Amino acid sequence: MSFKDLRSFIDHLEANGELKRISYPVDPHLEMTEIADRVLRAKGPALLFENPTNHSMPVLANLFGTPKRVAMALGKEDPLALRDVGELLAFLKEPEPPRGFKDAISKIPMFKQALNMPPKTVRNPACQQVVKTGDEVDLTQLPIQHCWPGDVAPLVTWGLTITKGPRKSRQNLGIYRQQLLGKNKLIMRWLSHRGGALDFADFKEQFPGERYPVVVALGSDPVTILGAVTPVPDAMSEYAFAGLLRGERTEVCKALSCDLEVPASSEIILEGYIDPDEMAEEGPYGDHTGYYNETDKFPVFTVTHITHRKDPIYHSTYTGRPPDEPAMLGVALNEVFVPILRKQYPEIIDFYLPPEGCSYRMAVISIRKQYPGHAKRVMMGAWSFLRQFMYTKFIVVVDDDVNCRDWNDVIWAITTRMDPKRDTVMIDNTPIDYLDFASPVAGLGSKMGLDATNKWEGETNREWGTPIVMDPKVKQKIDSIWDELGIDDSPTL
C-alpha cells in the first residue's frame, strides 16, 4: 500500500490502531515532548495533538516512533521486509549484468520499478492552497515545539530542506534542524559535509555574495520523508527514489519564489533564501545524545513565502537520550543497510546498530570468517563504504555463531575471544559527529574496532578453545521426558 500524502497515511494508521488523537489542550512548550517521550518508550501510537495551546494548527508527533510504523510508511507490515528496500538500493548502487536468462527474468521487476523514477510536475498543488507573503509571513503562528527546558528557542525538526548546487543536475533533500529566530528567520543547522551545506558552498564559490534559494517542506508524504534519510545513490534524487518505493512517480510542483521543486502534497512550505553574510549563534539544544550540545554559528534562512494546505497539520518530533524517534528510525533502517553491506562484503551475516548507541555510534557485525585479519578488513570497509557510518565510533566484529543483536552473546564473545592489545584497532584523527563533545576536537576524533572473532593461525600461537555444546541426542531425550519431570516450564535453550 502506498500513500500519496501525509493525511492518507494518518488515516491508515488510525484505522489500524497506530494513531491516537488528543483533543485535550497540550502546550508545544515542553508538554508535548513529555507526552511523546512517555508514549514512545511504551512503544505506543503516533499522536495527533488537535488543540495545541495558543495555536489552531494540529501537531503530529511520534509518526515513526516504532520500526513497524516505519515499515508501514513504505508499504510493508514487518520491519524485516525493509531488507527488500536494501536489496533495491544495493542493486541501484552497483547493478550487475544478468548471469543468464533466468537471472534476467528475475531482474525485470527492478527495471520496471526504475521506470517510475522521474518525478511528475503538477499544477494547482495542495501545498499552495494558501499563500502568505510579506507581512503575512509569521513563523510564530506555527506550533513549533520547544522540546527541553535548556533549549534556547523553539525548533523546527522534521522539515525537508530542498537545495540545488550550481553544478548538479538534481536537487538534494536533507533534514536539518532549524532554530526559530524571528517571524521570518530560522537558523539552518547543516554540517559542512551534508548535501545542503555542500550545495551552498558550491553556490557561494560560483556566485559570491548572492542570495541562495532554499525551500523547506513540512508534512510531506511518508515515503518522501524517509527517502531523505535513506542511503540513496549519489546520482539519484530522493524524489526518484521515493517514486521507486511508492511504485508511482512522486508529484512535485515548482516553488513560487525560485526554480526548486517541492513535494506537491506537503502540508506546509517555507520558501526563502540564505544570505552568505548572515550567520547566527545556534543552540544550545537537547540532542539525540541525551545531552545539550555546544553553540556554534550557522547560516540564517530568511523566509519570504509560507504556503500551505487548507487546515494544515504541523509535523514535529523531539530528540533526546535513546530511545527517541531518530533511534527508532535507525532500528528500522538497520534492515535497509544489511543487503547493501552484503553486496560489497558477502561474508557479512548480519549488521546491528544498537539504538542505545545513538543510532550510529556503535555497530556490531557478524561475519563468516575466512582468513586471519578478516575482521579488521570488515571494520575498515564498514567505516568507509557508506557515509552514514563515517561517524561510527565503535565497531565490534563477531563470528557467525554469535547473534550480533544479543548483548549476552556479544559480551561473551568480547570477553572470551579478545585480547585487548592484540584485537583492538585504534584510529586517530577521523571524522566524528560535531555533537560528540567527548572527542578532543570538534568534528575530529578516534575510532575503535574490536575483533571478537575466534583467532586463526597467524593471529595466535595458542590452542584455541572449543565451545561447549551438549550432545544433540541427550537434548532430544530430555525434551521428550520434560513433562514427566514435574518442572513447570522448559527453558528455551
Swiss-Prot record:
Residues binding prenylated FMN: 175-177, 189-191, 194-195
UniProt-annotated catalytic positions: 287
MF terms (GO), sorted A to Z: 3-octaprenyl-4-hydroxybenzoate carboxy-lyase activity; metal ion binding
Membrane topology category: Peripheral membrane protein
EC number(s) stated in the UniProt entry for this protein: 4.1.1.98
GO cellular component: cytosol; plasma membrane
Keyword Signal carried by entry: no
Reactions the enzyme catalyzes: a 4-hydroxy-3-(all-trans-polyprenyl)benzoate + H(+) = a 2-(all-trans-polyprenyl)phenol + CO2
Cofactor entry: prenylated FMN; Mn(2+)
Any one biological process term the GO annotation gives: ubiquinone biosynthetic process
Localisation: Cell membrane
Keywords, in A-Z order: Cell membrane, Decarboxylase, Flavoprotein, FMN, Lyase, Manganese, Membrane, Metal-binding, Ubiquinone biosynthesis
Statement: the UniProt record of this protein carries the keyword Lyase: yes
Cofactor: binding comment: Binds 1 prenylated FMN per subunit.
Pathway this chain belongs to: Cofactor biosynthesis; ubiquinone biosynthesis
Chain residues that bind Mn(2+): 172, 238
Subunit details: Homohexamer.
HAMAP family in the record: UbiD
Family the UniProt entry places it in: Belongs to the UbiD family.
UniProt-recorded name of the protein: 3-octaprenyl-4-hydroxybenzoate carboxy-lyase
Organism expressing this protein natively: Shewanella sp. (strain ANA-3)
